[in-house]
């Protein structure tokens, strides 16, 4: 089983947020970053699925060179491979982010074969967007289960567990 999990680098909870001198942006010079909590759950799920069914897991993130910290975190949990998509410092909206991730997935799959499962966190911890995973699934013409709290794989079939209400 080949599992890809996409993670987002977000400001650490409780971090002091400073604004740049011009008042137009967040000053990230002394800001601590972490992996979004929803993606931490997805990383753990990917590792558990590979432990149960064999195969390999890959973590992918886009960001500055410092985002390799989030990739090392995923590797410490047990993810086998890591991919960093370097980006400029410009603002990245969900559409642009999804397009970059889609392109990267297509490139990886053309070289190494398709992923059996692609996991995203339910929403980003910083902006609260629920869009990137949906946009990537649509662009790749893949099925999607939103709000899943876990996955069960039985041969070639999978079931996403979800809590509602």
Predicted regions and their residues:
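N-terminal glycine-rich FAD/FM-binding segment characteristic of electron-transfer flavoproteins
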Residues: 1-165
């Amino acid at each position: 089983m080949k599992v890809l999990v996409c993670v987002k680098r977000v400001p650490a909870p409780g971090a002091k947020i400073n604004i740049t001198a011009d008042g137009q942006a967040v000053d990230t010079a002394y800001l601590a970053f972490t992996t979004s909590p929803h993606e931490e759950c997805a990383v753990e799920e990917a590792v558990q699925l590979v432990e149960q069914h064999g195969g390999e897991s890959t973590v992918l993130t886009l960001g500055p060179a410092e985002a390799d910290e989030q990739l090392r975190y995923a590797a410490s949990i047990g993810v086998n491979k890591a991919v960093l998509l370097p980006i400029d410092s410009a603002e990245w909206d969900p559409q642009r982010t999804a397009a970059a991730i889609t392109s990267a997935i297509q490139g990886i799959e053309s070289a190494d074969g398709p992923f059996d499962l692609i996991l995203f966190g339910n929403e980003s911890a910083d902006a609260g967007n629920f869009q990137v995973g949906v946009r990537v699934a649509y662009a790749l013409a893949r099925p999607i289960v939103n709000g899943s709290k876990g996955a069960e794989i039985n041969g070639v079939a999978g079931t996403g567990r979800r809590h509602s209400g």
